[in-house]
A protein has these predicted regions:
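Positively charged n-region of N-terminal signal peptides that target proteins for export
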Residues: 1-6
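Glycine-rich, small/hydroxylated-residue low-complexity segments
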Residues: 7-9, 17-505
Length: 505
């Protein structure tokens, strides 16, 4: 066989192999799309996915996925006349909201060198919202939809990059602007191991109304003598709040638990260069009320065959109100959460979404929540869960802390719950701890930060009152307090006291 013939045969084999690899890659991507669409239908309901089409080609394909939902209608207040509820005329005039659609178009290149990369396929997805009104379009006129790029490797792993371009939002005096955000994720070939990182240099929101829900006190409030209370004092008109977060970033790695979406053992680290909250009166200068810097945090999840435990740590420095802290710390531990109970909780949320949209998913009906608690509560307690939280700070050269925790030591039986109720049996079989240690020198500035001026004599009187009543102890330059509730008894600073009426019975 001549050299030319050998070269031709080799070239033909390469072309055949590449063509076969391209066809196989296309088949695998098509199969993955069908599986993802089926999982999505299962999660959000058959009616929510109105289209999932796939046009397959040899070197490239196109996929189209469309989700549809109808936004929740605004709540119309019900008027009362002489104690009878009357539906206002405006309720009948409420226009039914039109369905909205989220459209995802994906261009897919497949083959051993898809997209000039050694990969089985490269998927570029673009998103669009349909059905939004003109007001919403105008509010997001300077914003772009995110993009998603997925690289599927030959051995089954994949790289995901979610990118949100820089943009702006403005509506009814509230405005926001943000820098480019990027989220990079690597999913292992087992579809369980996930690693990733994200970067978001800046997010600023301005014009938020401050305390709008508390502008008016209850006008029907009566004083202790049964007389109508004085006219309520309205909060400052035009007071607004702004939030600015800069230098956000982080990374994570986890191994997903079967049947538990987005949760599994692993670690996450995050950082924020600066977080600032500013308030401003209508005609006054802005006032910085929170200014925290060098914020770092980490989360660790651990799991065994039946339970999941979570620990969080956050640290930073900066100012809250007039108090300039040398350091601030937050620690949290949630231990022994039953995995089956978490699965059932996620299932309840999904069922709520299918039945009534996002609002019902986030706030399930009272009877639905009660049924879930009755079914899952005993199993949750059998794992003996616990929760602990600690706040610590350094201020003016001194350290102080606040902490509390709760843990189940003995799971109650169904008979005990039926006889005495949840609260008494929980108190009998659980332990509650709380403690505080604060420098006395902090009290003046803490009171000032809350709008009260305390002189030395007033401070001494306040400390003496707290000490003589048994609620606090004086330990040199510190005020301390310790509380423990266990076996149906309350121990406050070493003194056993009866539980509040009704809790222990």
């Amino acid at each position: 066989m001549s050299n030319k013939t050998m070269v031709a045969v080799a070239a033909a084999l390469v072309v055949a192999a590449y063509g076969g690899g391209t066809w196989y890659s296309g088949e695998q991507v098509h199969k993955s799309f069908q599986e993802a669409a089926a999982e999505l239908r299962h999660a959000v309901g058959e009616d929510a996915v109105v289209r999932d089409s796939y046009e397959k080609g040899f070197f490239s394909s196109n996929a189209n996925l469309v989700l549809e939902w109808t936004p929740d209608a605004p709540q119309v207040p019900v008027e009362e006349h002489d104690g009878d509820e009357v539906e206002p005329a405006s309720a009948a005039a409420v226009t039914p909201l039109k369905p909205m659609r989220l459209v995802m178009n994906s261009d897919i290149r497949h083959g051993p060198l898809a997209g000039a990369k050694l990969a089985a396929a490269v998927v570029d997805s673009r998103f669009a919202l349909e059905g939004i009104d003109d007001k919403t379009k105008q509010a997001f006129a300077k914003a772009s939809m995110p993009t998603l790029t997925v690289v599927r490797h030959l051995m089954g792993s994949s790289d995901w990059r979610f990118a949100l371009p820089a943009g702006e939002f403005a509506d009814d005096g509230v405005a926001a602007r943000w820098a480019d955000m990027a989220y990079d994720v690597v999913v292992g070939s087992d579809k369980k191991s996930v690693t990733g990182d994200f970067k978001w240099p800046e997010l600023v929101i301005t014009g938020l109304p401050k305390s709008s829900a508390d502008d008016y006190a209850d006008e029907d409030q009566e004083d202790e003598d049964g007389e109508e209370a004085p006219a309520p004092v309205r909060a400052s008109k035009g007071e607004q709040m702004a939030i600015a977060v800069k230098g956000m970033g982080g990374s994570f790695n986890t191994t997903m638990i079967e049947g538990l979406w987005g949760v599994g053992p692993g670690k996450m680290q995050m950082r924020v260069a600066n977080a600032q909250v500013t308030t401003q009166q209508a005609d006054g200068p802005p006032e910085v009320v929170v200014d925290l810097k060098d914020i770092t945090g980490d989360t660790k999840m651990e799991a065994d065959a039946k339970t999941l435990s979570i620990s969080n740590h956050i640290n930073g420095v900066g100012r809250i109100g007039p108090l300039e802290f040398e350091s601030l710390g937050y620690e949290e531990k949630i231990q022994r959460l039953d995995i089956e109970v978490l699965r059932s909780l996620q299932q309840m949320v999904l069922e709520g979404y299918r039945a009534g949209g996002l609002s019902q998913a986030l706030a399930p009906a009272e009877d639905q929540l009660a049924e879930w608690m009755e079914r899952s509560g005993p199993k949750l307690l059998q794992a003996l869960p616990s929760y602990n939280m600690k706040l610590n700070a350094h201020y003016q050269g001194s350290a102080g802390h606040l902490e509390y925790g709760f843990g189940v030591l003995k799971a109650p039986s169904a008979e005990e719950v039926a006889e005495k109720g949840w609260m008494p049996v929980l108190l009998k079989g659980s332990v509650l701890n709380a403690s505080a240690r604060l420098p006395k020198a902090w009290m003046v500035n803490i009171a000032k930060a809350s709008g009260q001026e305390l002189g030395p004599e007033e401070l001494d009187a306040m400390i003496q009152m707290a000490s003589s009543s048994g609620y606090a102890r004086v330990d040199g330059d510190f005020l301390t307090a310790d509380l423990k509730v266990q076996d149906g008894q309350m121990n406050l600073n070493g003194v056993v006291k009866p539980l509040p009426m009704g809790l222990g019975r």
